[in-house]
């Protein structure tokens, strides 16, 4: 998702935004950044949720205060409450990360990993900013903007009994859904170009080249690990490249199931009919990102009239 180091002064500059789906997510993030209400960011692993949360903090009025990112899955059950709210044992006091981040922002990465009992205490904190340290009856207050992330839509986790319904309703006010990489095809080429530039500079090699087949493969691949997987795959390929030219074989990825051709599918079909089938699939994919026929024609390097006729021929965009 990023092609450069994060710049707190310009927090959203590191995002590659060409697809309509990602444009919507980033624009919502820019608007929601200015509010103090809890923010929920949902998206698959590797899609950039934590980076988006960080950008929201540095775009907000809290930008000069602390930003604390907490991996909820990494909090031991027996210590999670004291890590969040602090602890008092005799004369010894330890503050939690909410108190430490007072007037700043706390990112709870993987909110569903918290126990249901701790979710109840978090709900109370979200309601009025109050909490009690473990081992103490005195109430404390902290002014913190809370951002939560989840790989799975929270409403599904509510149905599974993993997330409290009341917490979900408290969080489901400002929500950003980060699209999976396979749903942002228009971003794959600029992401790949940016990553290759960044990686080649780190490895101190010339930026590798690639052809159209390589790019089409990137766009066809499922990318279960999303942007993070794309980056790691290109890093590995650049580390092993021999002649400064990347090929499909350089990626060392399993062939996408959708790319496997079965002869039975095309029994009694002519070559023109088979080509037409794949042409229609390509147009459907690109039309989702370029609903303007003029922009689609420009992207595919053909005339506006040719694209309009093809869309009409295949019944796309009716």
Swiss-Prot record:
GO molecular function, one term: cis-regulatory region sequence-specific DNA binding
Keywords annotated in UniProt: Aromatic hydrocarbons catabolism, ATP-binding, Cytoplasm, DNA-binding, Nucleotide-binding, Repressor, Transcription, Transcription regulation
Binding-site residues for ATP, renumbered to this chain: 43-50, 101-110
Notes on activation and inhibition: The DNA binding ability is drastically reduced in the presence of ATP. Tyrosine further reduces the binding affinity of TyrR in the presence of ATP.
Signal peptide (UniProt feature, chain positions): none
DNA-binding region: 292-312
Protein's name in the database: HTH-type transcriptional regulatory protein TyrR
Organism: Haemophilus influenzae (strain ATCC 51907 / DSM 11121 / KW20 / Rd)
Lineage start: Bacteria, Pseudomonadati, Pseudomonadota, Gammaproteobacteria, Pasteurellales
GN (gene name): tyrR
């Amino acid at each position: 998702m990023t092609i450069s180091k994060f710049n707190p002064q310009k927090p959203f500059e590191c995002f590659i935004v060409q697809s309509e789906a990602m444009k919507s997510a980033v624009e919502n993030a820019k608007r929601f950044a200015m509010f103090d209400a809890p923010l929920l960011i949902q998206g698959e692993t590797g899609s950039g949720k934590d980076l988006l949360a960080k950008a929201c903090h540095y775009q907000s009025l809290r930008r000069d205060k602390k930003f604390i990112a907490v991996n909820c899955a990494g909090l031991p059950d027996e210590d999670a409450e004291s890590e969040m709210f602090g602890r008092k044992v005799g004369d010894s006091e330890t503050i939690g990360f909410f108190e430490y981040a007072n007037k700043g922002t706390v990112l709870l990465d993987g909110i569903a990993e918290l126990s249901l009992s701790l979710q109840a205490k978090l709900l109370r904190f979200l309601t009025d900013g109050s909490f009690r340290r473990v081992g103490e009856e005195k109430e404390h207050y902290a002014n913190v903007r809370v951002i939560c992330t989840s790989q799975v839509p929270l409403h599904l986790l509510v149905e599974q009994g993993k997330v409290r319904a009341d917490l979900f309703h408290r969080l489901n006010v400002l929500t950003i859904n980060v699209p999976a990489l396979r749903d942002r095809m228009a971003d794959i080429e600029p992401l790949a170009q940016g990553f290759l530039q960044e990686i080649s500079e780190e490895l101190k090699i010339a930026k590798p080249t690639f052809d159209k087949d390589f790019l089409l493969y990137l766009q066809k691949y499922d990318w279960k690990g999303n942007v993070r997987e794309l980056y790691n795959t290109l890093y590995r390929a650049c580390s092993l490249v021999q002649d400064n030219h990347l090929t499909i074989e350089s990626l060392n990825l399993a062939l996408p199931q959708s790319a496997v051709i079965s002869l039975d599918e095309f029994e009694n079909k002519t070559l023109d009919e088979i080509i037409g089938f794949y042409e229609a699939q390509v147009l459907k994919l690109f039309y989702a990102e370029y609903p303007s026929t003029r922009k689609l024609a420009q992207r595919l390097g053909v005339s506006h009239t040719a694209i309009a006729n093809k869309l009409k021929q295949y019944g796309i965009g009716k």
